[in-house]
Amino acid sequence: MPANVAKGRTFTESARRAQIVAAAIAVINEHGYAAASFTRIAKQAGLSSTGMISYHFANKDDLIGEVLSEATTVAYNYISPRMEAATGYRAKLRARLESNIELVRAHPGHVRALMEIAQNAPKTPEFVDQRFGLFSGHLRAGQEAGEFGRFNPDAMAVAIIGAVDAMVIGLVHFPEVDAAEYGRELADTFDRATRPS
């Protein structure tokens, strides 16, 4: 079966792909994106050869794309219910920011993998663009609803993303820090920055 065939996979094939993706996440966490070779991933997964990876994934970019999909799905499933429970644009922005930071403690491996891929993989503009669009679109809609003040929503989105990423890096390096408290502080900061004057 060609590596890029997505439909008609057996349960065993799907399980093997999931095993390889989990191993790739572990290797990226331990060694970084650049050193995440098929050889290391095969060893981590307990596979007899790299050919078993190549059977399921056309190349490293194909595998990394699946890792990115898995990590973003985990993040979405964690953040989305918290946003849905909030009412109004300001409350939803707070929920998104707080849950983004708390995600570091809930799913540290997936967060580290996302960071490594976003910073080092050559083919991640779609992920970056989608993330930017989520924030800028939310801010723009909130302005139209009168819940946010006057500011450039694109510039504010860049500032928010930069602050989130910096805080995530800090939390990864300092595991003793209270992520929930940091999330509240971050949300407070941007609530003040975006509220109507």
Where are these regions (language model features)?
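C-terminal peripheral helix-coil segments that are non-catalytic and often amphipathic
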Residues: M1-N4, E102, F132-E144, A163, ...
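N-terminal intrinsically disordered/low-complexity leader segments
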Residues: M1-A15
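Helix-turn-helix
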Residues: Q19, V27, H31-D62, E66
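Hydrophobic alpha-helical connector segments
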Residues: E66, S80-G109, M156-I160, G183
